[in-house]
Curated annotation (Swiss-Prot):
Function: Hemocyanins are copper-containing oxygen carriers occurring freely dissolved in the hemolymph of many mollusks and arthropods.
Family, per entry: Belongs to the tyrosinase family. Hemocyanin subfamily.
Organism: Scutigera coleoptrata (House centipede)
Protein name stated in the entry: Hemocyanin subunit A
Upper classification of the organism: Eukaryota, Metazoa, Ecdysozoa, Arthropoda, Myriapoda
Record has Ligase as a keyword: no
GO cellular component assignments: extracellular region
Glycosylation sites: N313
Keywords in alphabetical order: Copper, Disulfide bond, Glycoprotein, Metal-binding, Oxygen transport, Secreted, Signal, Transport
Residues reported to bind Cu cation A: H197, H201, H227
Amino acid sequence: MWSLALATLFVLGTVIRADQCPPVPADTKDKLEKILELIGHVNRPLTPETPEPAGYDETKLKGLGILPQHEIFSLFDERTWPEATKAAEFLMEATDFEHFIQRADVLRHRINEDMFMYALNVAVLHRKDTRGVQVPRIHKIYPDKFLKQDILVEVREKVNHGEEKPVVDATELHQNQLDPNYRLSYFLEDIGMNSHHYHWHVVHPAVWLPKHGPRKDRKGELFYYMHHQMVARYDSERLSNNLPRTEPFENWDDPLEEGYAPHLTIHKTGYNYMFRPEGLIVRDLPELNKNKMRQWKSRILHGIHLNVLYAENGTKISLDNEHGIDLLGDAIESSLLSVNRAFYGNIHCYAHVMAARIADPDGRYGEDNGVMHDVATSARDPLFYRWHKFIDNIFLEYKDNLDPYTQYELTWPDVVLNDVTVKPHKGDYDDEVHTYWEVDNYELGKGFDYTRKTTATVKVRHLQHEDYHYEIDIDNNAGKAKKAVFRIFLAPKYNEKGELFPVNEQRQLLVELDKFVATLEPGHNVIERQSKESSVTMSKDHVFGEIRNLADDHQCSCGWPDYLLLPKGKYEGMTYQLFVVATDYEEDHVEDAGEECQCRDSMSYCGSVEHKLPDNKPLGYPFDRRIDGTGFEEFKTQNMYYGDVVIQFTGETVTH
């Protein structure tokens, strides 16, 4: 007996279809319009200003208005955290939606615009009465953080010459043989990828405390895993472009090999993100020196080797298998949930600040900070990935201290995974997927310094892949129907020298492609899963679409852009290996995860806004721990599969 099953969009706690989610409140679009009216002034000097509401109780505004308007708000600089926390609380504590709008209008006139947008995003995502409301993504509010200065100057010139709704072509890829990293500009400077990084930090604010709402389940682990995946994806892109994998940042006193020129300017304020020439050395800041950073790292590693962290009162907190990675994530990020911020410090965030101020650490020259200072721009810089590989290696130290999974733990006796085939929707080939360039329209609204009273369109080019599906051949020998969780990963097969990767090097490069639930009938089953259904990604509509068309969506869309699901590959084809693992849903699902309709997309990287992460397994399972033996074949159990997949870049450009 065999059956064909089509896998559905899922949450491990409960399988949820869109038609099972409660309807979005009828007033959602009205609420969106009120929010759009508020933020229509942000970063738009030519939008007519409204007067500040009068008569508000000034005592409730104490501590707000400290960060100057012309500065960039940095979530990495903890000196801004008290004000950012106060701003978010001010909006979160509003008694109803009308009160929320009143408070937001007051706040907008009082605090730094960049900070206001962050606080507003956090509040809208987490308030009960704004569920279903989709605030415009950060790249719609600040195009100047995502488009280079010369593009926006061209837009302004066309507007100044009287063009209505001008169109600027930003798709031409300039060759720069002097900077090898320029080959990666399609990835580093991708609008959706950088917007994803910002939005992840909105869903999981470093300043979040339990008093603001439910504790963020596994937030520290999600911090580790999402950034680990970003680094793994970056390394895959480097190998696709015949570049070696990025080296971790190691020595605070070594010159940095990478320079970076962002060519980004905030037109309203004139803020110009700093250029960093190669060869600079990270220097002490007035408020923090490099020795403190070394000390924080040493204390964290000491805790890993002892398998404990020390709380502020001196209590030992075990870094056990279940919660250890989560505790470490909160301490390393660090967030306000760290068990002991005074002792373990803020190593991740302050490294961003040090890198951003590398050319003017004490401010004597009045330079603006570099892109590493800003959550919305930091992932553009190659140094971001060197730094996060350094952070990743600290987490790896902890993971390598854990016992490897045993064959007993890995095996699902009821199931045999026979084969997996990757089938493109067009073409007569299997286990091969083609990538290419795609051109989309990035729409700029009215009121910016460069658009004035008209709208404008910038044509941008991004990577894309052909649609495909997985065909999974699997036997269920339990004698009754069983639910399976399928976990799908991809990694390059060969290193930069053309040699097979050692298994523990390769597992560090595994990127998650999907995680889903399907029912296995007794006997033989063939499961189909579409690439577009990935639990990792968000639709490109959230990057290039119209916000009003998304107002009735149940998605919070914190995920990876769907068009970057696969790495670029090579013209001649590049061999990757696909890893698929089937595990028992009954063991994996979380009973009290709740029906999370609001954020049923992007669950793998982003988790849940207010419920438990609906998967009992560690993120990245079963490749999150070291593998003993010489290869995957020794590790593999009957419920696992691996095989070669070729990704070929065609070089074609498709315009929509």
